[in-house]
Design a protein with these regions (language model features):
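Extended, hydrophobic beta-loop-alpha segments that form or line the acyl/peptidyl-thioester binding
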Residues: 373-413
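Soluble acyl-CoA-dependent acyltransferase catalytic core bearing the H(X)4D motif
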Residues: 1-3, 26-38, 44-48, 55-372, ...
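N-terminal alpha-helical "arm" segments
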Residues: 1-18
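Generic N-terminal amphipathic, Lys/Arg-enriched alpha-helix
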Residues: 20-26
């Protein structure tokens, strides 16, 4: 039976018509199957046994929210890209996939198989599988779980029950909780929101072809004190130096970091973006401490009742009103300041227990989408003992090779 989408998921669906938001989850395996069609058939059988992978969008009534409905897993959801290729050519092919965004009314995900890739990091020759997922179907954490189900991870993925309620009551509750939040901020019990940051060249609108790069390291190279903090510290070092070398002032450099929500099971997307200063002017040890403190502060802010009340009020927004508001969004609009100059999305994709045609997973990567205000984004993705730090950049606004070279040095310190 169809179930209604949560407001935040519907907004993701409608926004995809303005700003493409498909996610591309890359998994690299340490060998190539003898028979690729058999490995693809196995993946299809796994999909058929997971109800959440059978969902598609039904959006046929303007005044109500779209619904999730179950459907068949089609053969066209599995695309094999034949032939041998090198790792750089594979990344170029992955980048090109973004030109064909999903229509969630037809399919909410698609699997791309590159069966023979040479010169991969951490493996000489292997297979690359890219799972393309519409953002309405899941945020970074849920999409990783769905991809895991396709690639052999055991365990059910729980369905989501959309939260509804009476908008006036929830609005009043949110207003009262917000007043308490302001009092708590003034008393120093809760941190204020991160301040807006001035624009830099990496905040120019993309003008060229997108380019992706991936650095793969052992987990212990970044996990001081955590992988996310280690990656942010290295990115601060590399990006601060890159910008300063071009005559820009990186002193207020900041990252926009998606932070997982409370996990209340009411939406496929449960996260919020927070601004985190990168503190380029201090030494690495102090920088790591300051970044850790800011992340902890934003986590405390997210746990305040006002945040939950605001989410509940948003969930009760009438569908027609939210659809109208999303339709008014101007993707070409510019703002004078940003919460973060670059995106750093960090997701732990679990144990190295995935397989494709008998080959074991070696590493996983992801490439957060560029946007009209963002010409450089980062993905930090771990599986097992390997972490991939990936860069997605506009080829005109960013000297990708220079920046990635700096990032490689910063990670190795």
């Amino acid at each position: 039976m169809p179930r209604s989408m949560a407001a935040v998921d519907a907004q993701m669906l409608w926004m995809s018509a303005k700003v493409p938001n498909d996610q591309f989850l890359l998994f690299a395996f340490d060998g190539s199957p003898t028979r690729v069609p058999d490995a693809v058939d196995e993946m299809r059988r796994r999909a058929q046994s997971c109800p959440e992978l059978g969902l598609g969008a039904l959006d046929n009534i303007k005044w109500r929210y779209p619904r999730w409905q179950s459907g068949e897993i089609g053969a066209d959801q599995f695309v094999t890209h034949p032939g041998a290729r090198g790792w750089p050519d594979c990344l170029d092919a992955v980048t090109a996939l973004a030109a064909d965004q999903l229509d969630l009314r037809r399919m909410s995900w698609r699997a791309h198989v590159f069966p023979e890739v040479h010169g991969m990091p951490a493996a000489a020759t292997g297979t690359v599988v890219v799972i393309q997922i519409g953002h309405a179907l899941g945020d970074g954490k849920r999409s990783a779980a769905l991809a895991g189900a396709l690639l052999g991870r055991r365990g059910a993925i729980p369905p989501v029950a959309a939260q509804r309620g009476w908008l006036p009551a929830r609005t009043v509750a949110a207003w009262r909780a917000h007043r308490q939040l302001l009092r708590d901020i003034e008393a120093g019990a809760v941190p204020p929101p991160a301040p807006p940051r001035p624009l830099l060249s990496i905040n120019d609108s993309p003008r060229g072809n997108p380019v992706v790069r991936t650095l793969v390291v052992r987990r212990e190279q970044l996990s001081v004190p955590t992988v996310t903090i280690g990656a942010l510290t290295a990115i601060s070092d590399a990006l601060g130096g890159y910008l300063a070398g071009r005559g820009e002032d990186p002193s207020l450099l900041s990252a926009e970091v998606p932070m997982a929500g409370a996990g209340n099971g009411h939406a496929h997307n449960d996260f919020r973006n927070v601004g985190v200063g990168l503190h380029v002017a201090v030494d690495r040890a102090q920088r790591a401490r300051l970044i850790a403190e800011e992340l902890a502060a934003q986590r405390r802010r997210g746990e305040h009742p006002a945040m939950r009340a605001a989410s509940a009020a948003f969930a009760a927004t009438p569908a027609a009103l939210l659809r109208w508001g999303t339709g008014k969004f101007d993707p070409e609009g510019r703002v004078a300041a940003v919460s973060g100059n670059t995106v750093v999305s960090s997701v732990n994709r679990g144990a190295a227990d995935l397989s494709f045609g008998g080959a074991s997973v070696v590493f996983t990567a992801g490439y957060p989408a560029l946007s009209p205000m963002m010409s450089l984004t980062h993905g930090v993705h771990g599986i097992g003992e390997h972490v991939a730090v990936s860069v997605h950049a506009d080829s005109v606004n960013v000297d990708v090779d220079d920046y990635v070279g700096r990032l490689r040095v910063a990670i190795g310190r």
